[in-house]
Curated annotation (Swiss-Prot):
Higher taxonomy: Bacteria, Thermotogati, Thermotogota, Thermotogae, Thermotogales
Protein name: Chorismate synthase
Cofactor binding note: Reduced FMN (FMNH(2)).
PANTHER family reported in the protein's UniProt record: CHORISMATE SYNTHASE (PTHR21085:SF0)
Catalytic activity reported: 5-O-(1-carboxyvinyl)-3-phosphoshikimate = chorismate + phosphate
CC cofactor: FMNH2
Gene3D superfamilies on file: Chorismate synthase AroC
Residues that bind FMN: 115-117, 276, 291-295, 317
Subunit structure: Homotetramer.
Cysteines engaged in disulfide bonds, as pairs: none
Organism for this UniProt entry: Thermotoga sp. (strain RQ2)
Annotated Pfam families: Chorismate_synt
Keywords: Amino-acid biosynthesis, Aromatic amino acid biosynthesis, FAD, Flavoprotein, FMN, Lyase, NADP
Keyword NADP: yes
């Protein structure tokens, strides 16, 4: 499977093209609408999100709601115009401005923002949401939520997956801990008043992923390699940890095996469901660190690249924090990565053929008497 994303932040459309989607898959457009709404409507968003409607259109690869096997193209119109009309020459610390100017040497810093703006993640969100229709056929579910925003960290996160989803959806910042949600909202209000911005942390879980997805032979097809590649492409993401961050002692960290009713289980899942680039049958889970947005309400010190004189950074329409919407985007990103690895594993064709291959697999299972039986 291949995902291509194009479009400028203030151009006519953001575009996602998915190649390699099997034929015969029924697409649930309501999932796409819901995920685009969640990305757009969360606490801490700026003025632009009130202008956008994100009314997507699927213009190829789907006929009568069913995929044809051809590339699937999703268009998301941009409604908001560019608020900056003049040439901008003062770079913002933490943004693409200066580094892109040094490399590409175009004099207007506005040019670089069109591609590096997080607006393109609306296309990633749409693509990931569409792929949830595929994952649902294999009983795989993906869920993302906020675990930290500024100095506030979630402490009471439900273990039950459906309760986790319900509490996440009840939160204005997509945090499943109600007490932490209140604190995060206060953090956002305080940062907005001070002209500051906030970073934080997001967790994404993929439940139901079978063992044996990914690769150990091809370094770039390792599932953790693919996760890192796509997640680090998301603006503001500065760190990705698969599984637990507490990895100091082997006795505490390594997931020991045990037998339960003749099946191999793990006592813990600190490794995040991946060993050596291949899924091991446990939930795949990822911690993502999101930096503060570089456009602050209070100006920062910079340099005017035209005059080479000290200058203050301009304010360009922006959010207070990217953390809540990043939880939606990262959820979509994990859906893309898991779908890609799953299709690579199962091959091409009609969705019913893929489901038969999936159901008939006996990996790994031995009949030499060493193991009685092992199921994914």
């Amino acid at each position: 499977m291949r995902l291509t994303i194009a479009g400028d932040s203030h151009g006519k459309y953001m575009i996602a093209v998915l190649e390699g989607i099997p034929a015969g898959l029924k697409i649930d457009e309501e999932i796409i609408r819901r995920e685009l709404f969640r990305r757009r409507n969360c606490y801490g968003r700026g003025k632009r999100m009130s202008m956008e409607e994100d009314a997507f259109e699927i213009v190829s690869g789907v006929w009568g709601g069913i995929t044809t096997g051809a590339p699937v193209t999703i268009l998301v119109p941009n409604k908001a115009g560019n608020p900056v009309k003049d040439v901008r020459s003062v770079p913002r610390p933490g943004h693409i401005d200066y580094a892109a100017f040094v490399k590409y040497k175009l004099p207007d810093l506005n040019v670089y923002v069109e591609r590096s703006s997080a607006r393109w993640t609306v296309a990633l969100t749409a693509a990931g949401a569409l792929l949830k229709s595929l994952l649902r056929e294999f009983n795989i579910d993906v869920l993302g939520f906020v675990t930290r925003l500024g100095n506030v960290e979630a402490k009471n996160i439900p273990d039950n997956f459906e309760e986790l989803r319900r509490k996440r959806d009840e939160s204005a910042v997509f945090c499943p801990d109600p007490e932490a949600t209140e604190g995060m909202i206060s953090e956002i209000d305080r940062a907005k008043e001070e002209g500051n911005t906030l970073g934080g942390k997001v967790k994404v879980i993929a439940r139901g992923v079978p063992a044996g997805i990914g690769s150990y032979s091809d370094l770039f097809k390792k599932l953790d390699s693919k996760i890192g590649s796509l997640f680090f492409a998301i603006p503001a993401v500065k760190g990705v940890v698969i599984g637990s961050e507490e990895m100091w002692y082997g006795f505490d960290y390594l997931d020991e095996f045990e037998l339960e009713d003749g099946r191999i289980k793990r006592r813990t899942n600190n490794l995040g469901g991946i060993e050596g680039g291949i899924t091991n049958g446990e939930d795949v889970w990822v911690n993502v660190f999101v930096k503060p947005i570089p456009t602050t309400g209070k100006p920062l010190n910079s340099v005017d690249l035209r005059t080479m004189e000290p200058a203050k950074t301009p304010y360009v329409r922006s959010d207070v924090t990217a953390v809540p919407p990043a939880s939606v985007v990262c959820e979509a990103a994990l859906a893309v990565v898991i779908s890609d690895a799953l299709l690579e594993h199962l091959g091409d064709g009609n969705i019913d053929d893929l489901k038969r291959r999936f159901g008939n697999e006996n990996l790994p299972r031995w009949d030499d008497g060493f193991w009685k039986e092992y199921d994914r």
